[in-house]
From Swiss-Prot:
InterPro entries: Cecropin (IPR000875). GO terms for biological process: antibacterial humoral response; defense response to Gram-positive bacterium; innate immune response. Cecropins have lytic and antibacterial activity against several Gram-positive and Gram-negative bacteria. The lineage of its organism: Eukaryota, Metazoa, Ecdysozoa, Arthropoda, Hexapoda. One of its GO terms (cellular component) is extracellular region. This is Defense protein 4. Keywords: Amidation, Antibiotic, Antimicrobial, Immunity, Innate immunity, Secreted, Signal. Transmembrane segments: none annotated. Its main location: secreted. It comes from the Eukaryota. It comes from Lonomia obliqua.
């Protein structure tokens, strides 16, 4: 199991190095912007699910002491 995780880490490091070496600065910034938008959209879409959890578990669990 340890050997497999080392191989995965090495492959991901190699692919990251290849990506950085082939991507221009503009492309990198566009990719970073896309990641930020996906994170924002994920947070927004998780809102209704969090509301359902709050309602189902009652007020004591989510209130601050």
């Amino acid at each position: 199991m340890y050997g497999m995780s080392v191989r995965i880490l090495m492959m991901s490091s190699l692919s990251a190095c290849m990506l950085v070496s082939t991507v221009t600065a503009w492309d990198f910034l566009k990719e970073l912007e896309g990641v930020g938008q996906r994170v924002r959209d994920s947070i927004i879409s998780a809102g209704p699910a969090i509301d359902v959890l709050k309602k189902s578990q009652g007020p004591r669990r989510w209130s601050r002491p």
